[in-house]
From Swiss-Prot:
Zn(2+) 2 binds at residues 111, 114, 132, 135. Zn(2+) 3 binds at residues 125, 127, 141, 143. May be involved in environmental stress response. GO terms for biological process: protein ubiquitination. The keyword Transport does not apply. It comes from the Eukaryota. Keywords: Metal-binding, Stress response, Zinc, Zinc-finger. GO terms for molecular function: DNA binding; ubiquitin-protein transferase activity; zinc ion binding. SMART domains: ZnF_A20, ZnF_AN1. It comes from Oryza sativa subsp. japonica (Rice). This is Zinc finger A20 and AN1 domain-containing stress-associated protein 11. InterPro entries: AN1-like_Znf, AN1_A20_ZnFinger, Znf_A20, Znf_AN1. Induction: By cold, dehydration and salt stress. A zinc finger (A20-type) spans 16-50.
Length: 170
């Protein structure tokens, strides 16, 4: 008990440094080591000062100029025109009914082997079909996926054959 009274507790309070915003008023926190500029503004200012022969003082730095990258619009327009052409070519009477039946049957998840409804607990096999918990393993259903060749290809892809140059002996 006497030992506890002699021990003086020191405060273990951690203080975070005050956050200062960027000097260019971009909204990001500034760093005192970079004259209160954020990383983006500092990189832009250093790039502009290195490209120009006259170095600007930190108080007279201007806002950084970011290049504007324009996306190619021709690809978007051509794909939109192709989609319109595809829509125009479809007949509207017959396939609409069959597509509604197909979407209705695909929304019901059933086991491929026993046709039991599996819902969200279904397991998708590597052969591409959906199975229940009883048929989820490849030996429980007639799986058409070749696991041996897939593993062989994966091993060959991950471990390429390295051949050294032939040593010429004199």
């Amino acid at each position: 008990m006497a030992q506890r009274e002699k021990k003086v507790e020191e405060p273990t309070e951690l203080r975070a440094p005050e956050m200062t915003l960027c000097a260019n008023s971009c909204g990001f926190p500034g760093n005192p080591a970079t004259n209160n500029l954020c990383q983006n503004c500092f990189l832009a200012a250093s790039a502009s000062s290195s490209s120009s022969s006259a170095a600007a003082s930190p108080s007279t730095t201007s806002l950084p100029v970011f290049p504007v990258v324009e996306k190619p619009r021709q690809a978007v327009q051509s794909s939109a025109a192709a989609a319109v052409a595809l829509v125009v070519e479809r007949p509207t009477a017959g396939p609409v009914e069959s597509s509604s039946k197909a979407s209705r049957s695909s929304s019901v998840n059933r086991c491929h082997s026993c046709r039991r409804r599996v819902g969200l607990t279904g397991f998708r096999c590597r052969c591409g079909e959906l199975y229940c918990g009883a048929h989820r393993y490849s030996d429980r259903h007639d799986c058409s996926f070749d696991y041996k060749s897939a593993a062989r290809d994966a091993i060959a892809r991950e471990n390429p054959v390295v051949r050294a140059a032939k040593i010429v002996r004199f």
